[in-house]
C-alpha cells in the first residue's frame, strides 16, 4: 500500500461545563490523504504527528506527503486540528501495517492535542466522556437530536482562547459546572435528551472567552427562545452551538439574527456515530 485516505468528523467539545472532557462528533468531515514518498514540507502539525508515531511504534521512519480537503473550518472550535492529526496518524498506521489499534492512535492524538475532548469523538464517534485518566465512554446519539451551529468568518486560535482563562475558580462556580456536566453526561448516556434542558450553563471558561466573543450570550439566548434545549461555545470558539429536539431551522434563523456579524453562517448537523474511517 502506497497511499491511504482517512475521513475524520468535525467535533464540538466542552458542551458548556464539560471542559476538556466532553465532546460530540458531527456529520461534517475532512479527508486526509497520506502518500509514501517525498513531497512538500510536512508542516509542524504533520511532522509532530509523524515523530510521535514513529517514536512510539519504533517503526522505521519513511518519507511521506499529505493533503487535506473537506468542510471543517479552521480555528472555529470544530476540531479541525484533530481531523488533521487523526488523519495523519491513521494514515501512517495503515501504511506501516497497523502496528497500533484504534484506541492507541486516539491516545497519541490526545497527547498531541493536550486534551482528549475533541480527539475522543473524532476517533470513536457519538457523544464521548473523555476523562484525563480512565477509559473513554462513547454513546450513540439519536437522529432526533439536532445540533445547530453559528459559525463566524473570523478565527479564534485555541492558544489565544486558553490564555483568557483564570488560574483559579470560586468553589461555587466549580460546583455548578461539575453538576451540569454530570447532568449532560447522564442525559446522553440514557438517550433522554429532554433532560439536557438547562444543563449547559458554565462558569469555567465561557464567561472569560465571551470577552472576545461579545455575541456569545445573545446567540445562545436566541436559540433557546426559539426552542433549543441549550447552547454553548463550541470548543474554544468562535462557533456557537445549540442542541434542539424541534424545529432546528427556526433555531438556526434565530441564532443568525441575534449575531451582528454579516459574515456568520448557521448550519444544522446531526451526530456522527462512526468516528474516523479508513477510506483507502
What residues fall within each predicted segment?
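Solvent-exposed alpha-helices and their adjacent loops that cap or buttress functional pockets
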Residues: 1-2, 12-14, 23-26, 58-59, ...
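ATP-binding N-lobe of GHMP and related small-molecule kinases
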Residues: 1-76, 90, 94, 98-100, ...
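Short beta-strand-to-loop capping motifs
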Residues: 36-37, 152, 242-246
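Short, conserved charged micro-motifs
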Residues: 39-43, 158, 247-254
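Gly/Ser-rich oxyanion-binding loop with an adjacent helix/lid
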Residues: 61-137
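Active-site rim beta-loop-alpha module in soluble metabolic enzymes
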Residues: 149-211
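Glycine-rich, charge-dense phosphate/pyrophosphate-binding loop(s)
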Residues: 188-280
Amino acid at each position: 500500500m502506497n497511499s491511504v485516505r482517512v475521513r475524520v468528523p468535525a467535533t464540538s467539545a466542552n458542551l458548556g461545563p464539560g471542559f476538556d472532557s466532553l465532546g460530540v462528533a458531527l456529520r461534517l468531515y475532512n479527508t486526509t490523504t497520506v502518500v509514501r514518498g517525498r513531497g512538500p514540507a510536512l508542516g509542524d502539525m504533520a511532522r509532530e504527528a509523524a515523530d510521535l508515531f514513529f517514536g512510539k511504534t519504533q517503526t522505521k521512519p519513511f518519507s511521506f506527503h499529505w493533503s487535506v480537503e473537506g468542510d471543517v473550518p479552521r480555528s472555529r472550535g470544530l476540531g479541525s486540528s484533530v481531523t488533521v492529526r487523526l488523519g495523519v496518524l491513521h494514515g501512517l498506521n495503515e501504511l506501516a501495517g497497523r502496528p497500533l489499534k484504534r484506541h492507541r492512535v486516539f491516545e497519541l492524538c490526545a497527547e498531541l492535542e493536550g486534551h482528549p475532548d475533541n480527539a475522543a469523538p473524532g476517533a470513536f464517534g457519538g457523544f464521548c466522556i473523555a476523562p484525563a485518566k480512565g477509559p473513554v465512554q462513547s454513546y450513540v446519539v439519536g437522529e432526533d437530536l439536532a445540533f445547530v451551529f453559528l459559525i463566524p468568518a473570523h478565527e479564534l486560535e485555541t492558544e489565544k482562547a486558553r490564555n483568557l482563562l483564570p488560574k483559579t475558580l470560586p468553589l461555587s462556580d466549580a460546583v455548578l459546572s461539575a453538576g451540569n456536566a454530570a447532568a449532560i453526561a447522564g442525559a446522553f448516556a440514557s438517550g433522554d435528551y429532554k433532560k439536557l434542558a438547562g444543563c449547559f450553563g458554565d462558569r469555567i471558561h465561557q464567561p472569560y472567552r465571551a470577552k472576545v466573543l461579545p455575541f456569545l450570550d445573545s446567540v445562545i439566548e436566541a436559540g433557546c427562545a426559539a426552542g433549543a434545549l441549550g447552547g454553548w461555545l463550541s470548543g474554544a470558539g468562535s462557533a456557537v452551538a445549540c442542541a434542539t429536539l424541534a424545529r432546528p431551522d427556526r433555531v438556526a434563523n434565530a441564532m443568525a439574527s441575534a449575531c451582528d456579524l454579516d459574515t456568520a453562517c448557521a448550519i444544522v448537523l446531526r451526530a456522527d456515530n462512526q468516528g474516523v474511517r479508513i477510506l483507502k
